[in-house]
Amino acid sequence: MIGKILPRRQYSTKFDTEIWHGRTHTEVPLVRLAEFSEELFASYSGPDLGLACEEVKNCNDNFHKVAGAQSWNKKDQRAYGLCISLYDQHPIYGKMSGDPIADAFAICCRKNNAIMLIADGVNWGEKSRLAARCALYGSMEYINRKLFQEKTQPASTQEALEILRTSMDAAHRTILKKEGGLTTLCVCLICPVYNSADFAVCCVNVGDSFAYVFSKNNGIREITVGSHDVASERDIRDAGGAIGPVDGENPELQNLTCSLTFVNKGDVVFLTTDGISDNFDPVVTKVAIPRKNTDNNSNDALPTTPDTFEDKPMMEPQERHIYALKEMERIIHEHELLTEETCSAQELCGALVQHVLTLTDSKRKILENPELYRKKKMTSKERKRRDSQIVEQMSKAPGKLDHASIVAYEVGICGEDEEEEEIVLIKESNSVKSKKKNHH
């Protein structure tokens, strides 16, 4: 039986910041959930309508609703997303490298719950972009239909994760139906908890698109930490898993992980593609160097030129993971100091995206140098020398060029603060009236 939403004064259960994870939904704690509100206040997808684009929409969609919402351009400062390209632009023709953007995000928020999705199409091209958008559509359509059309709302955290896991299968089928390519996918459901003011964050991900929580009291923690071994070196070129036709019609679910944590009102849950997360890794940002690695497949091989690692510390993989989280925190706190306000979901997206855009600027400038594109006669030896100089300059410049996306949600019951303020105002008004009456 699904519990009713209780008044704040009756809430009793509190949870800590621990993260649970496993291959299946049964490997995380079973916690009872409260009733899900159907009152929608935000539904936003991008870029360019994201899951609601014409190539993805199902011909059976209701005229007024696509994947459970009437509009996918209904954003809010508590529910927001951004998607940009960090790649260079041709200085003469204006064409962007890496186009079209193959990342996509979607968020659908109701009064006390939220569905968040992010996908990163593997490699470049139209099929990659289509795969990411199809994944969002298939997953979002399934979750919204199950929860709010068929009224089969999850009674527990395990049931919520089971729904998310099945939504991944729906995402995969949609990709195959539309003949898309491969994509990562991270699916998140923020749920009200029975007899508690806390919320459960249920998450299923495959590939290297990750989920995080920013807490004003506890900093940033990664929810999807169980999907990759933070104690081992990793090849940042390998996503670790993907849905879509990897092997015939089969996906690659090697790192698929079900995760659970609990959050408080005011915390911000955010999902990112690796264009954001990798650009906080101290090795990628050239702040540190990796430990010596004999694995030739690693993309973190130790630099060979002495000046590239002079005065830079050597970091173990786990240290790099912790540093990246702390660096994200620093960027958010600096934004709060600058604005003298608490960071909203929208501002958090803006702050992190602006940081990675600024970080990678020197890399873009190297490739956007007009001199590289002037037509002039060069011997093969001169061309080879020029190309090696560009490679060396790029290796020294911080950051990684990629598509970069983020979607964020500020946890809470939408409208609760306004209702509490209204109650206070009514009480104050009644108090004033009572004093006036006694005075007369």
Report the location of each language-model feature.
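… and, occasionally, acidic/histidine-rich disordered N-termini of signaling adaptors
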Residues: N60-R110
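Conserved beta-strand elements of beta-rich interaction domains across eukaryotes
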Residues: N112, G121-W124, P192, S209-A211, ...
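Short coil/turn segments at secondary-structure boundaries
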Residues: G98, A119, R129-A131, K216-N218, ...
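Primarily the active-site beta-strand->alpha-helix module of PP2C/PPM metal-dependent phosphatases
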Residues: S97-P154, V284-T285
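C-terminal catalytic subdomain
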Residues: M1-V66, G244-H440
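DG-centered beta-turn motif at the end of beta-strands
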Residues: A119-D120, L185, D208-S209, F270-I276, ...
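Hydrophobic "anchor" residues on beta-strands that sit immediately upstream
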Residues: M116, V204, V268-F270
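Catalytic core of PPM/PP2C metal-dependent serine/threonine phosphatase domains
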Residues: I101-A104, A135, K151-N217, D235-V263, ...
